[in-house]
């Protein structure tokens, strides 16, 4: 056993309303969830407070983004301090949709990671290659570069979960094979060992995201270096329970 606690995050993205969030919370609260798995639900900003009030205290909540400073003239942004004020402990940063739809740079994501950690939030930091990058054989080059910008901004790795999400597998129904996922996770751990420390490489959780379903989760979860999942669409459905219990 690695000693790393299995971690399952649900990223609701821009989905849901009060009615559906309450229904989902009731489903999760009444389900038998593996007590050895850490569970976090990423709610839309406007529903952070509501999700926190409806979910069982054993289920944490994450914001899906935050800005790199505490307050100021940044219309539409939210700060880690505001997130914490809602009773929320985590934030997802660097998701491929933030990178590719909203044009966030590696540098900006690194700055956001630093500020979130300084303010006591846990960070789910996302990395991953696009299809043309995988086909060009530069997967490692891309994910190592993204990881470096994150690593350069981390002082305390105990509050960081790395999420490897191959962009070509997000919302497409394509999933990296368990072997493909394990290969990248293993290479990431080696990179951390070389560039950060062996202790961090052994302790940091590296989770997988990209069309994870109730049907694919068990075999993925059996991979040595795969410490959990960041789940998109399936986190809005009852099958999220099967994914949480993939290690049960």
Curated annotation (Swiss-Prot):
Binding residues annotated for substrate, in chain numbering: 11, 13
Active site: 95, 165
InterPro entries per record: Aldolase_TIM, TIM_sf, TrioseP_Isoase_bac/euk, Triosephosphate_isomerase, Triosephosphate_isomerase_AS
GO annotation, biological process: gluconeogenesis; glyceraldehyde-3-phosphate biosynthetic process; glycerol catabolic process; glycolytic process; methylglyoxal biosynthetic process
Locations listed in the record: Cytoplasm
Keywords: Cytoplasm, Gluconeogenesis, Glycolysis, Isomerase, Lyase
Family to which the UniProt record says this protein belongs: Belongs to the triosephosphate isomerase family.
Record protein name field: Triosephosphate isomerase B
Source species: Danio rerio (Zebrafish)
Gene name per UniProt: tpi1b
């Amino acid at each position: 056993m690695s000693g790393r606690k299995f971690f399952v995050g649900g990223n609701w993205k821009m989905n849901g309303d009060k009615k559906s969030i309450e229904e989902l919370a009731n489903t999760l609260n009444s389900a038998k969830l593996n007590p050895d798995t850490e569970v976090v639900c990423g709610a839309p900003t406007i529903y952070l407070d509501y999700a926190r009030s409806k979910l069982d205290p054993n289920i944490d909540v994450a914001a899906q983004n935050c800005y790199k400073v505490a307050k100021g003239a940044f219309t539409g942004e939210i700060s880690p301090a505001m997130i914490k004020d809602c009773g929320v402990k985590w934030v997802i940063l660097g998701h491929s949709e933030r990178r590719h739809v909203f044009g966030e740079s590696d540098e900006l994501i690194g700055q956001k990671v630093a500020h979130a950690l300084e303010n006591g939030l846990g960070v789910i930091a996302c990395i991953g290659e696009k299809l043309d990058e995988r086909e060009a054989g530069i997967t490692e080059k891309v994910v190592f570069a993204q990881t470096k910008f994150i690593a350069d901004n981390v002082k305390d790795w105990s509050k960081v979960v790395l999420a490897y999400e191959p962009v070509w597998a997000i919302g497409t129904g394509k999933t990296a094979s368990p072997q493909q996922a394990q290969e990248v996770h293993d290479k990431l751990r080696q990179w951390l060992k070389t560039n950060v420390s062996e202790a961090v490489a052994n302790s940091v959780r590296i989770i997988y995201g990209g069309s994870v379903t109730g049907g694919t989760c068990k075999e993925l979860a059996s991979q040595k270096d795969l410490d959990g999942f960041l789940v998109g669409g399936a986190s809005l459905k009852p099958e999220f329970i099967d994914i949480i219990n993939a290690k049960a």
